[in-house]
Structure formats: C-alpha cells, structure tokens
C-alpha cells in the first residue's frame, strides 16, 4: 500500500469526504452533499464559494434536517448558478441527512460538506487531480480553522482532524 497525500483546504469546520470508486476518466461528476440544520447564513456562504469552482462538473444536494429556520429560499436563489437540488426531511440528525443525500446523488464521486464550510475556487479541481493520481475508495484530511476562531476553537479543530494522510486502495 502507499500513502495518499490529501490536499489541505481552507474551511471553517470539519469537512467530511467520501467517494465512490471512479470507473473511468469520462465520469467526472461530483455530487456534493450538504446536510443543514438551522444555518441559512452559513449555507449561503458555502453555496457562494461553490459558484466559483474552476472544475464545473458537479451537482449540489442540500438536505435540510428539519430546520425551523428556512434555508430553502437561499438554496433556490442559486438555481441559476449551480446544478442544485433541495430536500427536506424530518429532523433525524446529520447522519441520516448525509445518507439521504447520497441516495439522491447522481455523480460518481460523493463529497459530504458540513454547511459551515467555505471551499477555495480550486477545491474540486485539486480533489479530481488527486483522485486521478491515486486509486482510493475514500479520503479525508485536516481542514484549516477559520481566521475568526478563538485559540480554544482552533485547538478543538486541530485535535479532531489532526491527520493528513490516508492509505491508498491497492489494486
């Protein structure tokens, strides 16, 4: 086996990544799953960052986990800028919301982002290049704490995601 370096991205909190195995270089579609609960302003920041991606072959699936503060109007405001779908489920926690999003995914590569993330413009391009270079079934890595975080928040952020490599899948 080998070690697969994972790109380091500037995000607010923990970002989770999962991917299905890429079957061919022709299938280059990402499905970005975003579970959200009562965070319309954060989902707006994340969606805005996704509009600037240099890699354009992706869809966005927002799964609202029973929010009492509506985020559907914010999601709908991106219909003309993103390939985006919105689903509402009864409050069941982020795990079920993520799983529901995966069920709706049409892309070959599934990425799960928390609603409080902000991704740089080259994020998907870098992920795609890394996935083409290394054969992996799943990947993850450290994220960068937002500059507005306190020292305690930065320490908690570091302690929860202090790894940066994942073993590559052997073929």
Regions found by a protein language model. Give the residues of each.
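A structural helix-start
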Residues: 36-44, 64, 68, 120-121
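Conserved small/polar residues in nucleotide/adenosyl-binding loops
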Residues: 1, 164-171
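Short aromatic/hydrophobic "clamp" motif used to bind/position activated sugar donors
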Residues: 110
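Conserved donor NDP-sugar-binding/catalytic core segment of glycosyltransferases
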Residues: 122-153
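The conserved acidic donor/metal-binding loop of glycosyltransferases
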Residues: 114-118
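N-proximal low-complexity "stem/linker" segments adjacent to membrane-targeting elements
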Residues: 23-52
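Glycine-rich, basic loop-to-helix element that forms the pyrophosphate-binding segment
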Residues: 89-105
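Acidic donor-binding segment of Leloir-type glycosyltransferases
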Residues: 47-88
């Amino acid at each position: 086996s080998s070690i697969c370096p994972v790109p380091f991205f500037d995000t607010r909190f923990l970002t989770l990544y999962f991917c299905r195995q890429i079957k061919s270089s022709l299938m280059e579609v990402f499905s970005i799953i975003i579970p959200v609960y009562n965070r319309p302003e954060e989902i707006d920041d994340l969606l805005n960052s996704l509009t600037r991606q240099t890699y354009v072959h992706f869809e966005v699936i927002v799964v609202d986990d029973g929010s009492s503060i509506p985020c559907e109007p914010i999601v709908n405001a991106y219909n003309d800028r993103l390939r985006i779908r919105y689903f509402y489920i009864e409050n069941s926690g982020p795990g079920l919301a993520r799983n529901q999003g995966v069920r709706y995914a049409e892309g070959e590569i599934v990425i799960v982002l928390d609603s409080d993330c902000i991704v740089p413009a080259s994020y998907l391009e870098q992920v795609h290049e890394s996935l083409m270079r290394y054969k992996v079934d799943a990947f993850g890595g450290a994220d960068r704490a937002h500059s507005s975080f306190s020292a305690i928040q930065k320490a908690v952020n570091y302690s929860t995601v202090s790894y940066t490599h994942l073993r590559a899948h052997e073929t």
